[in-house]
């Protein structure tokens, strides 16, 4: 059996020795439930950390697009100009005005999820999280890789305003479900 596909996209293509598809499609990840439960039960921002290409960004993007009227994504690697833009903000109102201008779309209070991706290259965003969450107008998600190594020099970690979940590749149960093993076999 061979596993290949586009990493980080929760897509899996499994082929047996004869080349026949065993599984070709989306995988139900436990991470999807973790994200949904977080936003249903907490007002803190959610930070997904972990290795590259394990589905962090995909999971947040999927959740945000399915559950919010307005989903705003800023990727600090693909949009490096955003780093300086946010570094110069003086207040939450100034930060949100800069953000709205940067993404060129209106922000809907109570119905917008902001997703800051690749935060390891913009540690200042973590300092802002406390103040953004306190304002209570929007919801926030962040993701990044190698955060423990990259975020040593953060001015202020937002304790109590940020919930961190470490994301790993598929666990065994997710894998066997992806190849079509049913609940009866798994529960036995």
Which stretches of residues belong to each language-model region?
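Phosphate-binding site recognition
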Residues: 1-188
């Amino acid at each position: 059996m061979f596993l290949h596909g586009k990493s980080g996209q929760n897509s899996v293509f499994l082929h047996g020795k004869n080349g026949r598809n065993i599984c070709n499609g989306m995988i139900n990840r436990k991470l999807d439930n973790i994200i949904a439960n977080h936003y249903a039960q907490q007002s803190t921002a959610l930070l997904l950390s972990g290795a590259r290409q394990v589905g962090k960004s995909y999971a947040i993007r999927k959740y945000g697009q399915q559950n919010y009227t307005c989903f705003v994504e800023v990727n600090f690697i693909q949009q490096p100009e955003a780093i300086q833009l946010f570094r110069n903000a003086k207040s939450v109102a100034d930060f949100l005005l800069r953000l709205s201008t940067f993404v060129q779309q209106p922000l809907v209070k109570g119905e917008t999820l902001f997703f800051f991706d690749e935060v390891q290259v913009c540690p200042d965003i973590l300092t802002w999280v406390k103040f953004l969450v306190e304002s209570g107008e929007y919801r926030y998600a962040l993701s990044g890789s190698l955060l423990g190594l990259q975020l040593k020099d953060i001015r202020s970690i937002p304790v109590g305003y940020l919930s961190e979940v470490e994301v790993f590749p598929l666990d065994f149960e997710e894998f066997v479900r992806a190849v079509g093993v049913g609940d009866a076999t798994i529960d036995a």
